[in-house]
Structure formats: structure tokens, C-alpha cells
């Protein structure tokens, strides 16, 4: 079942369908993976070279039948799709211990490649027409899509740790480091529409998916292919991230421990493409410098009981797909999805207070409360686009989330199941997202946020 609803009808106290479909999907996936890791120990130094490769191919055929209530038509739809995903990541790293383990230096060089291809995606829609009581389905604008995406990224990191032997009761540790990453994306897509000539339309009214794309049907009196590729169907983008941090682990005796630090990040995003109309060029160049402090304080009441207080600030940067103006048709949603070049980064302030109980080795009981404040949270929203559905992304004003969480880990030795444990995690979350004055959106729960989460095993 694949249903979509219009706004709730308060007068009739009922939901109204936008569409109501029955979907059937056939899918086959093949995977190929390779892993190669190499390490070398030399004195107080350790070197590692890690490689990971994955290739995944998926072939799928989707068939749909139902009613589009917005256009008041019965429809049938087919999608044939092959997707190929390739990922590779390689990392060369080293770790060096200096001065009797009082100092440690580690570094990393990395490269990653990712590719996604849809070499020939076919979509066919048929609309029902009734004449003199005779119902027939007429093929409407069969379409073929081709798209190719490539990501290349390089990264480097350097970290240093120094231990201070001030006294037996006070042994602070200083950590500092830098990080850099550069990522570049190239995206190209093409779109072709099969147009039926007037003289041959009725003859091919009830074509099905298996025959409509046959090369034998391409002729001057039947079907011709028309390219409908837009300038917005291709874009290039890159982002640069530079970061530095300093942190300290502090302890006062055996009861009080604290981890404090701050991380500075410089981020630059560039995008070259066109708006969805294919006329107006888009040249995006954004940069920002942010600071992210963090504090984690733990107080040991005794060997089995501990109270922990934590605070941290984080960022949720918009992904490429959330920014680019490329319009992608999602068959499952029966809707177009496009990005928003005006999207802002979202920031979160996180606070956490927990009580921790350790009844036995390997066992824990933790209960706590948390609060999160989000500024400019990114959410997917509906936008008007004629008779079809279209979604994009936008920033809400702010959002809050708070709740309680319970964690339990219990060994099962007492019932004869040695080596096995029972684990439980449950949370209640209340969230609310707020929109600026004048917005068509109403304040509501955060998108995709469930009020209850339970994991056990």
C-alpha cells in the first residue's frame, strides 16, 4: 500500500487521499567487497595501511496501480531501474609513543571515492480513459533517465597527547590536534521523453512496459525521442573543512573527573549549477567559522554509583542533495525532490544529566534526562508544483527536544546462561519545532522524531 493524504479536513473530521496506490516491487541485489589491512610495528611506533572496497548493484522493477485523486484519474505505472554504487576508502596512519608513554603523536592520511550510477532508468505511466463505456489505458510520456555521480575526497589529521605527572592525586592529560578535508563532487544527468505521434497514438494505447521502449517502435509515424535535459541536471560542488581542537582530561582524586575542550572549524562550500528552470545560473560560495565547546563531568559517589553531567555543541551541515537545485523524480513517493540553495547550517546545544549504577562487573543501570536546543533545524517540506507533488528542504526557526532515557545491561549467569547478557534501552522524547511568523507551517513535533524509542536484546 502506498497512500498520500491531503491536509486533514477539520469540518468532516477525516483525512482525504491525494493518491491511493497498490505497489509491487521485484528487486535483486549483488554485492562485492574487499578488505586489505597492513600493519608494521617498529620500536615505539606503529604504522597501518587500511583499504576497503565495496561494489553494490541493484536491479528493480516496480509496478503500480491506483487512483490519483488530485487529477481524478486511475493510473498504472512502471519503473525499471538499475543502480550501481562503488565505494573505496584508503587510510595510512602512524602512532608514535615518546618519553616513556608521557607523549603520544598520531597522524592519518586518507582518500575516499564514491560513485553512484543510474545508467538507464525507465518510467512509464498509463492513464485510464473511458469512451462509450469502454475503459482503456493510454500510455503517457514514457521517460528514460541517466545519471552519474562521483565524489572524491582527501583528508589528513594530526593529534598530540601529553600526560602531566603533577601528583598522585592530580594527573591531567592534554590533547590537541588539527584536521583537514577536501571533497569534490561531479554530477551529470540526462532525460529523454518518448513522444507519440498523433497518427499512431491509438494503435499503441495499451502498450505495456515490456514493449513501449522497443527500438523497433522508433519511426517517423510512431514514436520519436526528445531530449528534455535541463541545465540544472548537472552541477559541480566542493567543500573544504579545516579544524583544530584542544582538550584536557582532569581528575581531582578518585571522585571527580572532567573532560573539557573546544573545537574550531572552518567550513567552505562552493556550488556551480543552474536553478531548476535551467535559465538562472547558481554560484554558491559559503564559508563559516564555528567553535564547539564540550564539557563532561563525572562524580563518583562510591565504587558502584556515579553522577555525570555533560554539555556539547554540534552542527548539522546541509548535504549536497539538500542544496543542489537538481530535480529528481522519486517513484516511491510519486513526487519530485529538489534542493534549496538558501539552506543554512543547523546548530544544536546538547545537555545531559545521568545517574549510573554498576551493580557487578559488566553490568550497568543508567537513568538520565536530556535537553536539546536546535537552531535552524533542516526539515523536508512540500512546495506547490502544479498538479504534481514536489518536496524541498528548508530551515525552521528553532526546535526543542527533551526526555528521559533508561539503559540496562544484566548478565544472565544467574540462570545458567554464562557469557550472555540482557540489554535494554528505552527513551521518551518530547520534541517541538517552531517556525517564523508568517510561515505557512504550524508549530509541531520534529519531523521524523518518534516520541518513544525501545531497543532490547
Model feature map: region roles:
Residues 2-11, 30, 60-68, 118-126, ...:
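Outer-membrane beta-barrel translocator domains and adjoining extracellular loop/strand segments
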Residues 43-44, 99-104, 164-173, 252-255, ...:
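Short loop/turn motifs that connect adjacent beta-strands in outer-membrane beta-barrel proteins
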Residues 59, 64, 117, 207-224, ...:
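Surface-exposed extracellular loop regions of Gram-negative outer-membrane beta-barrel proteins
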Residues 1-62, 86-90, 100:
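Transmembrane beta-barrel wall of Gram-negative outer-membrane proteins
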Residues 42, 53-57, 98, 111-117, ...:
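Transmembrane beta-strands of outer-membrane beta-barrel pores
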Residues 1, 47-49, 103-109, 172-178, ...:
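Transmembrane beta-strands of outer-membrane beta-barrel proteins
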Residues 370-373, 390-457:
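Gram-negative outer-membrane beta-barrel transporters
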